């Protein structure tokens, strides 16, 4: 329920019902979700492929992220850059993102361009170009992105080191963007094998929300998408992360003005019943200036410039990560001590009904803000179908949150936010080299 849904009146959200979404599975295994919304003459179309860095292995890490880029570089019918050119010509825009578990392609366009978009999506899924010059060009782009977002980013390099330390067995160990040596050495066979298994119709959920009819969407899907042959899906990820038996620490020395500290705790996968209590816990601790951590660490003690907690959607058990930015002159140890004290207070002191209610309202407010737009609903429908196993759970968020008790929040705090279950990554500013 991450990044999700205040007291907005549900009667004003008549569209927020599972019956508004119609589904059909094509003969090649692609599942299509359609929600008609005729308020504006636009359409959001999202393709969720169940392929991410967890489906890679040492030697080929980063391939899923590579295809986030490569899918815009031409196919059999629509050549290099034509996807973007045609999209722009028709008044639309597009994007894509890659996670540990998924690669998602997003299209937003006028309803008049629906058939063109179906045709272009089918073209790149079925007949993506592997022109060697384009592959090498995109390899360079990805390598440059890695340098910018990881190697030359204090937060990026610390986050990468945190993941590598927190996961010793599971594929969440390596970064989504890939290790540098792997990016340099992918072969054409590596690329084609990964694309064939991951970007196949039977490994995809397509979501269409907007000024369309379900009949028109399915007719076009059967015309353009259904002829694409199914493929062998990615092999299941069998490796489970073993229980962590003690605190782990990693220190990064890097040129920086101020230290950074990331503190991670292993938590269950998204579809686990503890997801909702953990959402409330995370919100209670770090959502806004009235949250516990902000009031204690930013306002009262003035130890940090900012503090937040976050979890990502995850098909397998993941992490809750607390991020601390200590003020100038504040040792990271002082900041983390205050954090640990607040976590201890959460575990051992009663949570008031008022505080619990506030956290739930904040979550509902975030959720409904996303549900107001066709792009937000397309994204959430795909997330719930993939991560929760059923898009219909999107429409029971309020009931799920309402069932969370203060005792539930304290229970998950005691179960997961423990010393032996945490990994601490600290970036210590490195003094500038003196030149004699």
Give the residues covered by each predicted segment.
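Short strand-connecting beta-turns/loops that link adjacent beta-strands
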Residues: 38-40, 200, 256-257, 316
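N-terminal signal peptide c-region/cleavage motif recognized by signal peptidases
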Residues: 11-16
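Phosphate-proximal small/polar/acidic motifs at interfaces that engage nucleotide phosphates
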Residues: 236-239, 294-295
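Short N-terminal segments immediately surrounding and downstream of signal-peptide cleavage
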Residues: 17-37
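Sec-dependent signal peptide recognition
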Residues: 1-7
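Short, acidic/polar N-cap/turn motifs at the starts of alpha helices
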Residues: 20-23, 239, 249
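Charge-rich, well-structured scaffold segments of protease-associated domains
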Residues: 25, 82-233, 251, 261, ...
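Active/ligand-binding-proximal structured segments within catalytic/core domains
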Residues: 29, 39-86, 263, 273-285, ...
């Amino acid at each position: 329920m991450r990044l999700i849904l205040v007291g907005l009146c549900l009667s004003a959200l008549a569209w927020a019902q599972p019956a508004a979404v119609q589904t059909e599975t094509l003969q090649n295994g692609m599942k299509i979700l359609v929600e008609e919304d005729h308020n504006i003459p636009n359409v959001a179309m999202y393709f969720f492929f169940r392929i991410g860095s967890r489906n890679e292995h040492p030697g080929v890490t980063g391939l899923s992220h590579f295809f986030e880029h490569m899918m815009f570089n031409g196919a059999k019918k629509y050549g290099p850059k034509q996807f973007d050119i045609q999209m722009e010509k028709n008044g639309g825009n597009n994007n894509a993102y890659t996670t540990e578990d998924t690669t998602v392609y997003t299209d937003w366009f006028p309803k008049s361009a629906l058939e063109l978009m179906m045709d272009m999506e089918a073209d790149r899924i079925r007949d993506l170009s592997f022109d060697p010059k384009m592959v090498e060009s995109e390899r360079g782009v990805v390598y440059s992105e890695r340098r910018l977002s990881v190697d030359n980013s204090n937060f990026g390099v610390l986050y990468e080191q945190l993941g590598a330390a927190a996961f010793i067995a599971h594929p969440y160990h390596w970064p989504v963007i890939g290790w540098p040596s792997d990016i340099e050495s992918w072969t054409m066979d590596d690329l084609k094998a990964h694309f064939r298994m991951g970007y196949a119709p039977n490994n995809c959920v397509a979501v269409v929300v907007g000024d369309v009819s379900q009949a028109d969407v399915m007719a076009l899907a059967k015309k353009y998408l259904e002829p694409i042959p199914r493929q062998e899906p990615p092999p299941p990820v069998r490796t489970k992360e073993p229980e962590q038996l003690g605190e782990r620490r990693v220190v990064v020395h890097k040129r920086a003005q101020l230290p950074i500290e990331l503190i991670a705790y292993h938590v269950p996968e998204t579809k686990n019943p503890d997801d909702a209590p953990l959402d409330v816990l995370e919100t209670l601790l770090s959502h806004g200036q009235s949250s516990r951590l902000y009031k204690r660490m930013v306002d009262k003690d003035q130890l940090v410039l900012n503090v937040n907690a976050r979890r990502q959607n995850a098909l397998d058990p993941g992490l809750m990560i607390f991020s601390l930015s200590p003020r100038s002159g504040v040792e990271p140890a002082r900041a983390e001590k205050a954090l640990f004290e607040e976590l201890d207070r959460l575990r051992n002191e009663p949570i008031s009904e008022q505080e619990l209610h506030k956290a739930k309202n904040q979550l509902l407010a975030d959720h409904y803000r996303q549900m107001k737009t066709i792009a937000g609903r397309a994204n959430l429908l795909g997330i719930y179908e993939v991560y929760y196993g059923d898009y219909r759970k999107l429409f029971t968020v309020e009931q799920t949150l309402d069932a969370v008790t203060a005792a539930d929040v304290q229970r998950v705090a005691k179960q997961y936010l423990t010393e032996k279950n945490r990994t601490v990554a600290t970036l210590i500013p490195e003094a500038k080299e003196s030149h004699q």
